[in-house]
């Protein structure tokens, strides 16, 4: 059966973007259908029937799984497992840093930071395995399992997008042998499985939030839901859920988000339903889990239809991700995708390539829009490894051979001494390397060799305040000669995702250029964690409340998309100035957050016809009738026939038959356009009708003539 599905949404401020009157009831298959799972009592093992999008929304879930092992980092990969501590220095420097006081020799540097050159780092990973020494021959292991869930469209998305999220700290330390809540008798006696207890203990050692009562409860509920389900590598599926939640904890997510991260896959293939999660954990968690499921639905449709290869459609899909969901649901989906990318090896090469392509074109730019550079860098480098393995291996070797650790260590010591002499206090001075994928892109774009790129090696300095940033810049230029034209002031002129920092390139000791980045603690947290930055610091440590930060970040995502679209049309994003300075918007800013404002602007629609998806743009206030007219005469399926398309199609809006074709398309609506006649038989039926009509016409002409004569004669 031919099914056309449309998802309509506005690329406009997030004030009323989600209407609870337009809900989606969907139980759909997972993102990846290759990785097998063992059967369990709590999940169906039936295979989905291939037969159109209606089955996609209501049929059995496809079971998929993949290894959650994240303990196999690769040379040149920034997503390797890195041990995480809670110290301020590690938070500020992330995995980009190394300092003489901490890293005396190369062995520790390479052990603590998995990369081809010991410093090609991404932000802290969720991997719970101990740090391992770099090996040039190490391969990235991993599997992938993405599934989507059921129930409704995201409720209260604006309320949750701007609500308080800071409930991270807890003073209580809970022991899993004495849970402060009761569980059903059947589960109470079985929950002490060694692997589950060990997994929880490892998470608790890394992040205090896993000692929270609600997080422990979610852990054991997830264990019950996924019991018997295994990743393709043989690991329990529960490990993927915990690793996803640990990625969220790495960026400081609160207990609600971490709980939803643990449960993000439960709707699709376990006994859990939206109502079950609602009763057990409340609407906040239930709506987040459902929101992740809806985003997974879009992701699956995009991958099946190769949307990532279509630049304009991919860009619109970015906007849909941002506009459809609670911002925290987007973060959970990104964490889910990041861990699956970290464990991708279980997929066959063809699916691995397609999965990496979608991640590079959809999810990495999405992380960039959210301002989470740490996840963006990780995603890009993993995609680079799987899409271009030969280039990745070659460049990793080149970086490792060219890296001068002694020079970086000497530069750090020299800068620290100069700062102390000038009386400039600082938090961290660390060494860093440009990401492997960024180097690759720069080489292609500017047709340069690796030796001609000036910002591969670098230092990062975190100071107390903005004034000290400029003082420290003067110190840097006194120590080393400045490379002309390489100074960039992103403090006075922030990037569109809120990024602020001073960048300069100097000639370090010898002939190797050295990029130096100077920023405050607040700027660094914003750069690393974007929207989630307010989770990492207390209200008193930043200029603006978390409410304002969330509100402005949401609006900024739309601004970023707007200017990126302009850039693709020929304008330079670097030459345009932001409409408003962070964190407030001008009164006339079209992208400002207006809770009571009306939706304006185009409606972006996903149209699925013959199980093929395109992303199209409709004017505001478009109706189902407008969509039918576009899908009718302009469609190749209907062009040879004269009967109007609306007579051929039976639209369903959010699983409900449409009685009023004047119904307006709104944010997140899903419209199925099903032919009244099965598509397979449609052509045959209409050809037969045409033949019958022609035969009847031929016989009726002489008959009508005779009848006319008789009537005339009778009169």
UniProtKB/Swiss-Prot annotation:
Localization recorded for this chain is:
Plastid, Chloroplast
Give the highest taxon in the source lineage. Eukaryota
Taxonomy of the source species: Eukaryota, Viridiplantae, Streptophyta, Embryophyta, Tracheophyta
**Job description of the protein:** Possesses ppGpp (guanosine 3'-diphosphate 5'-diphosphate) synthetase activity in vitro and is able to functionally complement E.coli relA mutants. May be involved in a rapid plant ppGpp-mediated response to pathogens and other stresses.
- Transit peptide, start-end: 1-64
Q: Which gene name does the record give?
A: RSH3
Stretch list, region Disordered? 65-84
Q: Which reaction does it catalyse?
A: GTP + ATP = guanosine 3'-diphosphate 5'-triphosphate + AMP
Gene Ontology CC: one annotated term? chloroplast
| Protein's name in the database | Probable GTP diphosphokinase RSH3, chloroplastic
What range(s) does the HD domain occupy? 237-341
Does the record carry Iron as a key word? no
What's the EC number here? Answer: 2.7.6.5
Q: In which tissues is it expressed?
A: Expressed in roots, hypocotyls, shoots, cotyledons, rosette and cauline leaves, stems, petals, sepals, stamens, pistils and siliques.
Record-level GO BP terms = guanosine tetraphosphate biosynthetic process; leaf senescence; photosynthesis
Q: What class of enzyme is it?
A: transferase
């Amino acid at each position: 059966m031919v099914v056309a599905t449309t998802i309509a949404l506005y690329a406009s401020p997030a004030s009323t973007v989600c209407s609870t009157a337009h809900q989606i009831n969907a139980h759909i298959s997972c993102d990846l259908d290759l990785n097998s799972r063992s059967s369990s009592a709590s999940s169906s093992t039936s295979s989905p029937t291939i037969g159109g999008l209606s089955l996609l929304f209501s049929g059995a879930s496809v079971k998929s799984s993949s290894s959650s092992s994240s303990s196999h980092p690769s040379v040149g990969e920034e997503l390797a497992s890195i041990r995480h501590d809670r110290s301020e220095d590690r938070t500020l420097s992330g995995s980009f840093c190394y300092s003489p006081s901490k890293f005396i020799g190369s062995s520790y540097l390479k052990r603590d930071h998995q990369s081809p050159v010991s410093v090609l780092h991404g932000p802290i990973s969720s991997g719970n395995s101990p740090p391992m020494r770099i090996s040039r021959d190490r391969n990235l292991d991993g599997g992938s399992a993405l599934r989507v869930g059921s129930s409704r469209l995201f409720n209260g998305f604006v309320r949750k997008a701007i609500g308080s999220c800071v409930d991270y700290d807890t003073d209580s330390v809970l022991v899993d042998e004495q849970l402060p809540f009761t569980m059903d008798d059947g589960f109470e006696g079985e929950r002490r499985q060694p692997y589950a207890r060990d997994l929880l203990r490892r998470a608790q050692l890394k992040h205090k939030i896993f000692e929270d009562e609600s997080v422990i409860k979610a852990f054991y509920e997830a264990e019950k839901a996924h019991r018997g389900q295994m990743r393709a590598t043989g690991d329990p599926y529960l490990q993927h859920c915990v690793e996803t939640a640990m990625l969220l904890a790495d960026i400081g997510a609160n207990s609600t988000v971490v709980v939803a991260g643990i449960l993000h896959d439960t709707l699709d293939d376990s006994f859990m339903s939206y109502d079950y999660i609602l009763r057990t954990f409340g609407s906040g968690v239930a709506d987040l889990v459902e929101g992740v499921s809806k985003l997974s639905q879009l992701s699956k449709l995009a991958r099946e239809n190769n949307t990532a290869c279509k630049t304009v459609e991919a860009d619109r899909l970015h906007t849909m991700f941002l506009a459809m969901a609670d911002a925290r649901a987007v973060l959970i989906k990104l964490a889910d995708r990041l861990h699956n990318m970290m464990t991708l090896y279980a997929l066959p090469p063809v699916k691995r390539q397609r999965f990496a392509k979608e991640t590079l074109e959809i999810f990495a730019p999405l992380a960039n829009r959210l301002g989470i550079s740490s996840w963006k860098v990780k995603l890009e480098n993993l995609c680079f490894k799987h899409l271009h393995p030969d280039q990745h291996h070659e460049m990793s070797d080149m970086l490792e051979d060219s890296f001068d650790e002694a020079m970086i260590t000497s530069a750090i010591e020299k800068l620290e001494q100069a700062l102390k002499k000038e009386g400039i206090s600082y938090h961290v001075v660390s060494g860093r390397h440009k990401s492997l994928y960024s180097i690759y892109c720069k080489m292609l774009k500017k047709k340069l060799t690796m030796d001609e790129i000036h910002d591969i090696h670098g230092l990062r300095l975190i100071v107390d305040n903005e004034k000290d940033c400029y003082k420290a810049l003067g110190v840097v230029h006194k120590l080393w000669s400045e490379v002309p034209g390489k100074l960039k002031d992103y403090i006075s002129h922030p990037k569109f995702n809120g990024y602020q920092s001073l960048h300069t390139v100097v000639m370090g000791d010898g002939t190797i250029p050295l990029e130096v980045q100077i920023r405050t603690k607040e700027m660094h947290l914003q750069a690393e964690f974007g929207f989630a930055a307010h989770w990492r610091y207390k209200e008193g440590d930043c200029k603006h409340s978390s409410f304002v930060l969330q509100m402005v970040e949401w609006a900024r995502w739309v601004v970023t998309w707007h200017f990126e679209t302009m850039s693709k049309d020929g304008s330079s994003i670097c030459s345009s100035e932001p409409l408003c300075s962070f964190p407030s918007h001008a009164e006339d800013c079209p992208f400002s957050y207006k809770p009571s404002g009306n939706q304006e602007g185009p409606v972006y629609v996903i149209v699925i016809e013959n199980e093929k998806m395109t992303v199209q743009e409709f004017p505001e206030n478009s109706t189902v009738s407008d969509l039918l007219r576009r899908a009718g005469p302009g469609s190749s399926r209907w062009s040879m026939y004269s009967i109007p398309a609306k007579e051929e199609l039976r639209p369903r809006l959010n699983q409900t038959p449409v009685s009023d074709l004047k119904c307006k398309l709104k944010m997140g609506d899903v419209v199925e356009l099903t032919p009244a006649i099965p598509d397979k038989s449609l052509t045959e039926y209409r050809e037969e009708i045409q033949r019958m009509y022609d035969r009847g016409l031929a016989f009726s002409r002489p008959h009508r003539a005779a009848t006319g004569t008789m009537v005339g004669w009778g009169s």
